[in-house]
């Protein structure tokens, strides 16, 4: 009985190592910026002024305009940075975007609302959450609560290429 916690810990460590190995190591030119064009539904990974990769993206369920308050379904616009990486996301993998910034907070506070938060670049949801999302997930390309979505395979590639601190410019 005393061995069970040790065995469980070993399984957890081995399992975590196996998950970490599924993310390939990127050895190309570093990504110096991410640029998102909301109207075109495109995201570009840049090295200086050269496009390294481009992806089609899904956005928040009400994508027109800048995110101002929690629950508005908009994807923010402006300059932010990647401030965290989540290998255990329910959306496969995810990269946190530093929304809200000082201006976002100031505006939301001025109208007595929350600006929201937890905006990410992420992959698709797991099946349980897809079913809960219903028709929007399956039939609408803009299905997130304000995040930027790509396929799981694309997210694996993006996750391996992006470091914390990478600037992201989200444009109309």
List each language-model region with its residue ranges.
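Positively charged n-region of N-terminal signal peptides that target proteins for export
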Residues: 1-4
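Bacterial N-terminal signal peptides
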Residues: 6-15
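Sec/Tat signal peptide C-region and signal peptidase I cleavage site
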Residues: 16-20
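N-terminal post-signal-peptidase region of extra-cytosolic proteins
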Residues: 21-33, 59-83, 102-107, 152-153
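Short Gly/aromatic-enriched secondary-structure transition segments
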Residues: 50-62
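Exported/periplasmic cell-wall-interacting domains
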Residues: 84-172
């Amino acid at each position: 009985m005393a061995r069970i916690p040790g065995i469980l810990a070993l399984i957890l460590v081995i399992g975590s190592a196996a998950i970490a190995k599924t993310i390939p190591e990127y050895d190309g030119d570093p990504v110096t910026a991410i640029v998102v064009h909301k109207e075109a539904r495109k995201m570009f990974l840049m090295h200086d002024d050269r496009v390294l990769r481009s992806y089609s993206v899904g956005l928040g369920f009400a994508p027109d305009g800048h995110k101002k308050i929690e629950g508005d379904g908009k994807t923010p616009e402006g300059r932010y940075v990647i401030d965290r990486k989540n290998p255990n996301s329910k959306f496969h993998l995810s990269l946190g975007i530093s929304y809200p910034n000082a201006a976002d907070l100031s505006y939301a506070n001025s109208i007595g609302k929350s600006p929201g938060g937890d905006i990410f670049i992420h992959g698709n949801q797991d099946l349980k959450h897809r079913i809960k999302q219903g028709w929007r997930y399956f039939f609408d390309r803009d299905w997130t609560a304000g995040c930027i979505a790509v396929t799981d395979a694309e997210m694996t590639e993006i996750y391996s290429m992006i470091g914390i601190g990478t600037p992201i410019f989200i444009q109309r």
